[in-house]
Amino acid sequence: MTKRNLSLLFSSALILLGLGAYLFSAQTAVAQASPLYAQCQGCHQPTGAGVPGVFPPLAGHVPEILEAKGGREFLIQTLLYGLQGQITVKGTKYQGVMPAYAQLKDEEIAGLLNHISTQWGNKFPAGQKAFTAEEVKAQRAKTMTAAQVLEARNKLGLK
């Protein structure tokens, strides 16, 4: 084998290793978020469809939230501090309480938000990237009540 062929073989192997590591890390992040979603699916269902009039859907609604100014922050705040009060999603009213999940690590909350943002046909709006632990940490530095999170949601202009 010539030096050139050996060099090409070595370069190809490095590229494949790098690609494999990237794909593995992406799959690992989704796999780690999926067990966390088990805590959510009792209300929001495995399909993200929720229960009409009782628990709001995540499928089709999370992208609407992400498109609103302040939507990313609101989603993080909802997981950290919970949500209490009446909301309307796609014309259906919901009156209830979503518990806070502040006990989760910043990385877990980011992973869970990335999971619900990319499942059931949901996609990040153009130009938005995946949630990061740093974003969660910034929102964790604030102290909010579930009622204040509701106020933040009301400012998003969602229907």
Please provide the spans of the model-predicted regions.
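Gly/Gly-Pro-rich "capping" loops immediately C-terminal to redox-active cysteine motifs
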Residues: 49-87, 95-105
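Post-cleavage N-terminal segment of exported redox proteins
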Residues: 1-31, 118-119, 125, 142-159
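Electrostatic cytochrome c docking/interface patches
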Residues: 18-37, 50, 63-67
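The canonical Cys-X-X-Cys-His
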Residues: 37-46, 112-115
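Flexible coil segments in periplasmic/lumen-exposed cytochrome c-class electron-transfer proteins
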Residues: 89-90, 101-159
